[in-house]
């Protein structure tokens, strides 16, 4: 037993002295390998009497367990030390100046920039962000939004459908972010105040349309909500987003299945040598659609239209990004052209005028 204790002490000392994983592996082989010291002791158990085997076997197995645990602990320690050493050698001095060559500097994509601006503006008004899946059911995308059977938007030339299931139902790529509003109304009790930014899909592609595009929609459900509230929100948004103190807006009657009454919104602008200036001029430019939530939609989502009413609006993020920053072709937003991004993108450390104004 004294020899076993001395052997264990020696092996533990060798483990503690191992300076790297290779040295530690050598100690493991010398102790627990096929020809290792402890393995040799275990091989002698077969020649012992049952009484000796019971006593000696327990002692040898205990020594093996102690050595195994010590090896594991030392290996973990060495691994962490090696990682710390590597990380120390890879330290980046964040006080170093940026690369001077603009081509070597990354850019924030205009769509990411505009999404940040949108969420900042509406968050300042007390809106939360709601999200939902890109793949939707016909029920959430159309039926609960008061789209009757046979509505043109249900046709294959507008909507990307998946193959029918065995029961005949079909999933689809959402054609607007309105299904997120449906999910919100089904899962939350009023009052509700959310915006729903995200990707949407329609079978269309030209200079001003792409099969995948981005939308942001807003929804307010409460007692006593009315068009005056909607107009104020949209007016404040346009002033903040386009960074114009005085902006004139025009609300025109329109039709959307999910709102009644439905309106389209134009803002006053002046077109000058290919540029659009807002807040001046005699031209008008359509930017979004809106209206009071249709009672049928409220009922389909479990909200009593006799108690609550609400309003909603929606706009294309890609479109308003093009209007604000002077981009002429929607398709260029998705072409990953570094030259285009260097021209229209934003430097990561630049503080946008909008966010700067809100933070101060």
UniProtKB/Swiss-Prot annotation:
SUPFAM superfamilies: Class II aaRS and biotin synthetases, tRNA-binding arm. Mg(2+) binds at residue 260. It is an enzyme of class 6 (ligase). GO terms for cellular component: cytoplasm. It is found in: Cytoplasm. PROSITE patterns: AA_TRNA_LIGASE_II. Its EC number is 6.1.1.20. Keywords: Aminoacyl-tRNA synthetase, ATP-binding, Cytoplasm, Ligase, Magnesium, Metal-binding, Nucleotide-binding, Protein biosynthesis. Tetramer of two alpha and two beta subunits. HAMAP family: Phe_tRNA_synth_alpha1. PANTHER family: PHENYLALANINE--TRNA LIGASE, MITOCHONDRIAL, PHENYLALANYL-TRNA SYNTHETASE. This is Phenylalanine--tRNA ligase alpha subunit. The gene is pheS.
């Amino acid at each position: 037993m004294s020899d076993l204790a001395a052997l264990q002490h020696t092996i533990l000392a060798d483990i503690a002295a191992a300076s790297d994983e290779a040295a530690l592996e050598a100690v493991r082989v010398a102790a627990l390998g096929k020809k290792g010291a402890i393995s040799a002791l275990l091989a002698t158990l077969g020649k012992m009497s049952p009484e000796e085997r019971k006593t000696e076997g327990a002692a040898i197995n205990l020594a093996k367990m102690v050595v195994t645990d010590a090896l594991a602990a030392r290996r973990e320690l060495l691994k962490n030390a090696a990682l710390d050493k590597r990380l120390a050698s890879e330290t980046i001095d964040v006080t170093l100046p940026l690369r001077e060559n603009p081509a070597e500097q990354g850019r924030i994509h205009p769509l990411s920039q505009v999404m940040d601006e949108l969420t900042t503006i509406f968050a300042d008004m007390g809106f939360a962000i709601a999200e939902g899946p890109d793949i939707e059911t016909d029920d959430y995308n159309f039926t609960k939004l008061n789209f009757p059977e046979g509505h043109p938007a249900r046709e294959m030339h507008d909507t990307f459908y998946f193959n029918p299931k065995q029961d005949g139902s079909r999933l689809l790529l959402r054609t607007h972010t309105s299904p997120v509003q449906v999910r919100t109304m089904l899962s939350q009790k009023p009052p509700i105040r959310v915006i729903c930014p995200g990707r949407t899909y329609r079978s269309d592609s030209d200079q001003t349309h792409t099969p995948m595009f981005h939308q942001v929609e807003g929804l307010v459900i409460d007692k006593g909500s009315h068009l005056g509230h909607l107009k104020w929100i949209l007016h404040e948004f346009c002033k903040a987003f386009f960074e114009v103190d005085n902006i004139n807006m025009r609300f025109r009657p329109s039709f959307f299945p999910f709102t009644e009454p439905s309106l389209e919104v134009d803002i006053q602008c002046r077109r000058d040598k290919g540029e659009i200036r807002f807040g001046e001029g005699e031209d008008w430019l359509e930017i979004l659609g809106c209206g009071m939530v249709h009672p049928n939609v409220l009922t389909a989502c479990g909200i009593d239209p006799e108690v609550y009413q609400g309003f909603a609006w929606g706009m294309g993020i890609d479109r308003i990004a093009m209007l604000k920053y002077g981009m002429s072709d929607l398709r260029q937003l998705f072409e990953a052209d570094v030259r285009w991004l260097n021209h229209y993108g934003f430097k990561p450390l630049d503080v946008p005028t909008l966010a700067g104004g809100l933070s101060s």
